[in-house]
């Protein structure tokens, strides 16, 4: 997505210099750091964090286990790993709003720390993630970030998501290990002593979870009530704007200003022994540079650090006088430089990283105070190994002599040409861009290719780093787009599998698929037929695409206005699932809302199904169909469906066959009115789902026609289930309904509301 002039103007006007200046000054209030931990993107306690960071100046960070690959997509069709790519970008945008660094425990799409689906057990989760792997990543993140306070979002108790339990349990272990020189010494990072661990003193129960135990007692609270004095926006509202970037999860809601927002916490652990008599989470910690020398037992730096903090406070008070802000920031910078030079080794572990943070924060603020503007653009935002592109810096520095340097990924080269333009060359063996970066910072460049600006303030060299205005995506050496990558061949209705190739790179490559026994492959230019031979058996068949005999990748592109462009490169090929299924008779309609592709897969089987849009639903004559299939969440996501509810009921009573896929209680589902007879969907959902994908499925009514017509459902049909057995089961229903299946997780009561 290349930014247009209108995009740039909109972005500029949404963030004027005076507001950027105010926001850049806030981190100068404090030298403390606070790390929130969770399992998935959107687990952050955003309202509390917004107040801590934007009001109190606390350095914020989040350690998150995985990318939320197992969740649902409220805005598109991407699932699993592609959804993880989108949610990674969403999390970065959400973190940017509240000036929060973000760390992922999972490093790659293949990482064991994966959102494998809902879990009811922290132990099960850690078994799948690998506890040692989880702790290794957690410890590394703590040692890199050096938080004073760690605060998990959820409690490690039964009734919570197993991923949440696992992260909270691991947080306590990781805090201890991060301070242990013998633990993960191969990381080559200094140990770090977290000072406090807080737990939420509120219940995590709700529509999804059902905590079995009450929360721990409140020992202190964070009051997030109120508004930023310059922005005039409540911290809770800023938080909701941040959460609105979790768009695949439908996050973000309007909150009226002035509402109270108080977050009770429990001091669960401290490095000096638990002290529950606190007035603030900042008690016994160096909130500002005023307290740092005493805390670090470094009296010789007391005067210097106090001068620095005094100057920082004066800079904040001087807003929006840029000249005065600049003067005070230089004074602070000078004193911080003296403190770094004179800091004794015995105190350096508690002091130097805080002063390094202050130098970076001051540098960012100085750039705004001096009105240094730099826009970094690329001649193209997709490139191949071996190619070159141009990077241009549009630098406007009216009162300052600024030098721009291009920072390159390893083995890339740069040649300076005219007019602030640089020729960037990519190695011929470069790998595709990483869709799963494991770290994002709000106060520096994050892209491997970026620009560093340097200038002098007196004798002090100051620098900031800037990303290009859009991401650069390095694409594969060999790639192609396939008309289909997953297919179904029904032996009861066999057809040739047709695959066409487009976007072939290099364009003149020779294209072929790997051969498979039982199949014949014919080719006409870039069009292929996969023809099954007589005697082909059921199973999965994979045909890999080769270009000039080389393994090839396909590019899964994603483009949404709230995140920009993203992509993930995957091995190119076609997976064909061969089955033997008797097809139903009659006219079938599908009414969806964009959350499933059931109609797509029915057509792959050979079923003649007509997909009805919301507009078509409004006017369709239902009597024309023998069966109607209502898709996942469709009563919420298909705007016109509820207006035809009575017609649907009448159609069923007249003999129509209605199949409704799963819905949540909040999907415009009225237990008294949506179904033909009373049907209540269970909540919290944790109690009405079976997470074990291999759980035994008991056929309560083995002779029921649903299990026998037109195909007999046997035990083997429940094999190789993905993610979980099922969720959003019915809790109660009218006696008119007959439960067909019984399923349960280990040591839990059986559930009969999966299929009625």
Regions found by a protein language model. Give the residues of each.
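Short acidic, glycine-rich surface-loop motifs adjacent to enzyme active sites
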Residues: 145-157
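Aromatic-Pro/Gly-enriched surface loop or interdomain linker
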Residues: 554-631
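The feature marks non-catalytic terminal segments
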Residues: 2-13, 20, 177-373
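A short helix->loop->beta-strand "cap" motif at the edges of active sites that frequently abuts
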Residues: 57-58, 192-195, 654-657
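Catalytic beta-strand/loop cores that center a nucleophilic Ser/Cys/Thr
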Residues: 688-756
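Long beta-sheet-rich domains in secretory-pathway and surface-associated proteins
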Residues: 375-577
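A glycine-rich, often tryptophan-bearing local segment used as a flexible ligand/cofactor-contacting loop or short
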Residues: 633-718
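Active-site rim/loop-helix segments in enzyme catalytic domains that contact anionic ligands
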Residues: 2-144, 165, 172-176, 180
